A protein has these predicted regions:
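Outer-membrane beta-barrel initiation region
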Residues: 24-95
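Detector for outer-membrane/organellar transmembrane beta-barrel domains
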Residues: 174-177, 209-280
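Short loop/turn motifs that connect adjacent beta-strands in outer-membrane beta-barrel proteins
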Residues: 24-35, 92-99, 121-129, 166-175, ...
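Outer-membrane beta-barrel "beta-signal"
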Residues: 299-301, 335-348
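Transmembrane beta-strands of outer-membrane beta-barrel pores
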Residues: 43-47, 91-93, 102-106, 132-138, ...
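Outer-membrane pore/translocation modules
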Residues: 61-65, 115-231, 236
């Protein structure tokens, strides 16, 4: 989040727990052979509104009982804990790196997937990366999110897929990324509780999906120690249910302040987008449209005592906050997240 709305809102929340990355730029391949990686534990507070997502990592994100399917969702508050990591081994002579772990792009989409893949330097042409994506801890959604007046049952949402990235294209700071994901909901019962719907109507609400996305971004310096990275993301979410099928268009802007010798650094991120759906929703009698936006900021501080973990670089603390919202033309699909988080970052 995909229901386009809830993915977009949850994206900012989990993105914040990680801290913003430099527009998802690939890390340079080390000059020496050996192991490298990072671990970034964090805890956070999340106030979240959704009628679609049940929980993540055992943390509840929406209420079991929905009293009126024509209303916007009530808010739910929860703590969150994350432990993103990455482990890599570099073969310096061939400019090849094998890696396994958490991809920040997937955590941004509230997916908690893992990736195993290879990164290859190709000289002046840039860096290529390919990876296989699979579910780590599947999110849980409601079997029938439209059930009224009774406790709803949840079900797992699993995913597999692949990602290709070409970064630093011809020595520039331009990056192209393509991702394919297949999403399966274990027990899909959307609309089963509504007796007036036909079997064809319920078919329109199914959420299993083949999703493709293309991300285009460019990173540049606009002043000393200040960097910007605009990005455009197009997503085609081909859901089994044509009322759930959608095309999404998002513009994202990332800002980074990083100064050598300064223990403080800052990252900020803002996005604005919309999603257009394919067919009329059989429950609400109109075709869904979403407008979504969000903003977040994270401050990092390198500890002055040189604390490290098993030979890592000096540990960094981070603290941040975020707000994100999806405003749908159907109130039931509205989404909102308010978040704060703290954590530490170790890199080898």
């Amino acid at each position: 989040m995909k229901k386009s709305g809830f993915i977009a809102v949850a994206a900012i929340a989990v993105f914040l727990l990680l801290g913003a990355t430099w527009a998802s730029a690939l890390d340079p391949i080390p000059e020496e052979s050996g192991f490298s990686g990072f671990v970034r534990p964090g805890v956070g507070y999340l106030k979240y509104k959704s009628n679609m997502v049940a929980s993540i990592q055992g943390f509840d994100l929406s209420k079991e009982k929905n009293d009126d399917r024509n209303d916007s969702p009530d808010s739910e508050t929860t703590a969150l804990v994350t432990l993103p990591f990455n482990l890599a081994y570099t073969f310096a002579s061939t400019r090849t790196q094998l890696f396994f772990g958490t991809d920040p792009t997937d955590l941004m989409r509230f997916d908690l997937s893992q990736q195993i893949g290879v990164k290859q330097g190709i000289g002046s042409l840039g860096i290529l990366q390919g990876g296989f994506l699979f579910s780590g801890t599947p999110a849980k959604v409601w079997k029938d999110p439209y059930l009224e007046g009774e406790d709803r049952d949840d079900t797992k949402r699993k995913s597999t897929g692949a990602r290709l990235v070409w970064d630093r294209i011809f020595g520039s700071f331009f990056q192209v990324q393509y991702t394919y994901r297949k999403f399966d909901i274990d027990s899909e019962k959307s609309g089963n509780s509504i007796g007036s719907l036909t079997s064809s109507d319920r078919k329109l609400l199914e959420r299993d999906s083949d999703r493709q996305s293309v991300d285009l971004s460019y990173r540049f310096n606009f002043a000393k120690n200040h960097n910007l990275a605009p990005a455009f993301i197009y997503t085609h979410d081909d859901r089994d249910g044509k009322a759930m099928k959608n095309d999404a268009y998002d513009f994202q802007l990332t800002y980074v302040f990083l100064e050598r010798g300064n223990p403080f650094s800052f990252t900020g991120n803002a996005y604005l987008g919309q999603a257009d759906y394919d067919k009329r929703n059989p429950i609400y009698g109109k075709t869904q449209e979403d407008d979504r936006y969000g903003i977040q900021g994270t401050v990092y501080y390198e500890n002055p005592w040189g604390w490290s973990l098993f030979g890592s670089r000096p540990m960094n603390f981070f603290v941040g906050g975020a707000y994100a919202k999806t405003d749908a033309n159907i109130d039931f699909y509205d989404q909102e997240a308010i978040m704060g988080s703290v954590g530490v970052f170790f890199k080898w």
